Amino acid sequence: PLDKRENRLLKRSFDIIFSLLFFILLGSFIFPLLAIIIKLSSKGPIFFKQERWGLNNKRITCYKFRSMYKESSDIDEEGNFQQAFKDDPRITLIGKILRKTNMDELPQFWNVLIGNMSVVGPRPHPTQLNIQSMELVDNYMLRHMVIPGITGLAQVNGCRGETRTTEDMQKRVNFDLYYIQRWNFWLDLQIIIQTVINIFRGDQNAY
């Protein structure tokens, strides 16, 4: 469906309108408030930048509110990418709240405005995680056929947080591929609504 120009235009138009409304109605006061809280709670920058893979494997810079201590590393002692996990000591007290409520992802609306992310789509993974997964997970690279999103079908179906096993990642990718194959505008709206519901309900995999 997203190989059709009119569908891409519809999705892009929605992304721009939705993001602008977010910044005007919510971002104008949420961003300054969170910036102050983050700066007062721990040393380090307000925003966290990370290289991730976007459409057609293009490297993009993904923005988030910093939720970990400045000195934290995402590479373990064996040189492998270390995902955030439950009770992760790298995460600050404020960071736990931000991640639990998805508020750490809010700066990605800027990514949406500039066009390298969408409101809805497969979540973009860090470079190291892509490299680890592409050899182990069937059809993994096909998830990069569309622009990645802030939220996605996999996330509203419980595939959030750490992917401890290859099977966990395969399940996430299967949801991503289903989304790509079955995309329609109403599916995006359903995912957005379910994301909001999950935020208020709480997600045990959000950490």
Task: Give, region by region, the residue ranges found by the protein language model.
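A hydrophobic, helix-centered structural microdomain
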Residues: 3-71, 111, 185-207
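C-terminal terminal-structure detector
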Residues: 6, 114, 137-207
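Gly/Ser/Thr-rich helix-start
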Residues: 20, 45, 55, 96, ...
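Aromatic-acidic/polar surface patches that form glycan- and anion
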Residues: 26, 83, 87, 99, ...
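Short, hydrophobic secondary-structure boundary micro-motifs
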Residues: 34, 48-49, 120-122, 127-128, ...
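Short, glycine-rich, amphipathic interfacial segments at transmembrane boundaries or analogous
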Residues: 47-90, 151-172
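Short amphipathic alpha-helical interaction/hinge segments
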Residues: 73-76, 121, 204
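A short, structured surface patch at a secondary-structure boundary
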Residues: 84-147, 191-199
